[in-house]
A protein has these predicted regions:
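Small disulfide-bonded, cysteine-rich extracellular recognition modules and tandem repeats
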Residues: 18-20, 114
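Short hydrophobic alpha-helical segments that form membrane-spanning helices or hydrophobic packing faces
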Residues: 21-23, 176-177
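IQ-motif-like calmodulin-binding regions
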Residues: 2-14, 18, 25
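Charge-dense, low-complexity polyampholytic segments
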Residues: 23-31
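Active-site and NAD+-binding cores of ADP-ribose-processing enzymes
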Residues: 31-171, 177-278
Length: 278
């Protein structure tokens, strides 16, 4: 993104932005549908965008070689696109009633189980069963949950596209939550009106994206750097990818999944609940 130029965003005498027809304030206001929700828009793959994504990808690969896959902080290409879209803002949290209100308006309840990074493990013994097990400090669990909501955006890797994987099934989330603890799970609601790409319709949106990539005549390594379902969906302005039931989710349930790409498109619970009830 280009540097901020204050002269392009004039303010009134009290420091508030003056609205100009067709200007920056109006453009941003059009994208703020609900408080805290920034609606995405298609991003052109111009040379500057391609160079930015190549740069962060090279950094990810260097970290992978140096630190190993368990220490790499996710796909930085998607974090870069989130910044371009304005999706890198802290997530919004709400009360149980506020989440329920969104559900009644057509939102989708989602769950995500988390485990703190390996670097926070306190090893009390050996690596094998019966010789001790890793112990995650309580604060590490709480910090991981907070980071998902309001920390720097981080996107994991997955077969249906990189992003933040969630499930409509609390049982699926418990399988990924540290020791199945409720404190290591996050309940959230995908806002009504969120723009969702359908996994089973990917021939329509992803194949079209790849076709356009092919027409650009990019070098093979550059083109390969731009091929991921989650990355493509973000560039197209989608908030999430919906994967219907029946596709492998890594648990025994294989329920519907949503790969969340726009953190502002969900409302998180402010504090972990004390149960797994829907």
């Amino acid at each position: 993104m280009s540097d901020w130029d204050e002269t392009e965003h004039p303010r009134d005498t009290r420091g508030r932005f003056r609205d100009k027809s067709g200007g920056w304030v109006e453009q941003v206001a059009d994208r703020l549908v609900d408080p805290g929700y920034v609606r995405g828009q298609p991003i052109d793959l111009d040379p500057d965008v391609i160079e930015r994504l190549a740069r962060v990808r090279a950094r990810d690969m260097a970290e992978f070689v140096e630190l190993g896959s368990d220490r790499v902080g996710g796909d930085s290409r998607l974090a870069e696109i989130a910044q371009m879209q304005g999706w890198d803002a802290p997530g919004e949290t709400g009360t149980p009633q506020q989440l329920q209100d969104l559900l009644e308006q057509g939102g989708v309840r989602l769950w995500r189980g988390v485990t703190p990074p390996v670097s926070s493990v306190d090893w009390t013994g050996g690596l094998f069963p019966g010789k001790g097990s890793p112990q995650w400090p309580t604060e590490a669990i709480a910090q991981t949950v907070r980071d998902h909501k309001t920390g720097p955006v981080r996107y994991g890797y997955g077969i249906y596209g990189n992003g933040m994987y969630t499930s409509v099934n609390a049982d699926s989330a418990s399988a990924y939550a540290m020791d199945g603890e409720r404190e290591a799970a996050i309940r959230m609601v995908l806002r009504p009106g969120a723009r969702v790409a359908q996994w089973e319709d990917r021939e329509e949106w992803y194949d079209e994206y790849e076709r356009r990539l092919g027409e650009m005549g990019l070098p093979e390594d550059t083109r390969r750097n731009l091929t991921d379902y989650g990355l493509a969906a973000m560039l197209l302005g989608y908030d999430a990818i919906h994967v219907p039931p029946g596709w492998d989710d890594g648990t025994d349930w294989d329920d519907a999944q949503y790969v969340v790409l726009n953190r502002t498109a969900v409302l998180f619970e402010a504090e972990p609940g004390d149960d797994w009830e829907d």
